[in-house]
């Protein structure tokens, strides 16, 4: 599976044949939401050698006990990032996770994902907090109101660059849903109901 000269199908079949059912199951799951660093009292808490982040003296990008557990024992590689202290901390944390994953059997990399982070207004919602140092853009409804696909295209290029710099490999925001229920939390992420 590590031989780049083989086809994707051959490599996948070889890797799948080496994995246990538990390892395969872990690769199909997502982690709980991850805040970096996980603050005590917050919704996404974590410990470092049994201590809270503030008590531990660890760097803000250190891997928590819980993160080590889901990487090593539960074989999870899909991770949902929520709050981050800063883009720099996010990038360093992502690098630490990737280094850790490389040392584990099979060296399967991390797939770090995020809900939208570039909304023009900081709502305070944990899924949209990306640090104030990234670009701000309209939500989906705002792009639809522009009636200019080039604006949306430029956003996609900018957000892609920023996400990769943060270590994020999967954006969970793009939606093609037509929203007809205004009470739905994801309404602003769609292009509206009259597209």
Please annotate each region the language model reported.
Residues 1-195:
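N-terminal beta-rich core of secreted/periplasmic extracellular enzymes
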């Amino acid at each position: 599976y590590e031989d780049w000269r083989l086809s994707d199908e051959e490599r996948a079949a070889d890797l799948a044949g080496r994995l246990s059912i538990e390892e395969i199951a872990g690769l199909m799951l997502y982690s709980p939401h991850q805040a970096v660093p996980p603050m005590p009292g917050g919704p996404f808490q974590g410990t470092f050698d049994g201590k809270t982040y503030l008590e531990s003296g660890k760097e803000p990008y250190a891997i928590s006990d819980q993160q080590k557990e889901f990487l090593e024992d539960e074989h999870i590689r899909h991770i949902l990032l929520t709050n981050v202290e800063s883009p720099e901390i996010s990038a360093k944390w992502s690098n630490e996770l990737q280094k850790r994953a490389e040392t584990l059997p099979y060296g399967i990399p991390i797939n770090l994902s995020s809900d939208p982070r570039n909304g023009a207004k900081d709502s305070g919602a944990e899924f949209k907090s990306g640090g104030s140092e990234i670009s701000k853009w309209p939500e989906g409804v705002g792009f639809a109101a522009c009636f200019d696909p080039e604006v949306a295209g430029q956003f996609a290029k900018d957000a892609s660059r920023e996400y990769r710099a943060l270590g994020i490999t999967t954006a969970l925001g793009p939606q093609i849903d037509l929203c007809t229920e205004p009470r739905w939390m994801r309404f602003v992420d769609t292009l509206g109901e009259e597209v």
